[in-house]
């Protein structure tokens, strides 16, 4: 839920506002609930999500902005390709793959390819009906995807770094950090769809209020 509100705030207002609201609010939550060690990661990632979403979405408000459908199509293709590769890898080799020289097995959680395919197909639908969507909404979708992509990479890298600090080997750290990605991907997919769905009516409401003022 937290990422969804960060994205929504960044879309409705600015990336700075969205990033600050997310980093401060979720950072304080971690601090007050016994997760003090996670505060730096939370602050950096949530601000990054807001900043990236706001930066990308702001381009859609430019009168001369061109449709970003090419980039949405690329994102859709990448996600679908990842989902297909993971699916066939899991079905042919199994969900648990033994990597030579590493004790821990590489686990391909079905959630990874299922939600990768769902998100990819969702973006494909956006591309299909792009002509019915304004340039602003198209950039909002692209911004939300970019923000969640940043969060996925950030969560993974922070996880690897944290494990390396406590003495883990490099490859085991990578595998262990990858285990948390399914939950992050589910949260991210939910955040993108809900934030954009709420943004459409709320942005119109805010625009009408500005006109009335």
Feature names for model-found ranges:
Residues 1-213:
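Loop-helix junctions at membrane interfaces
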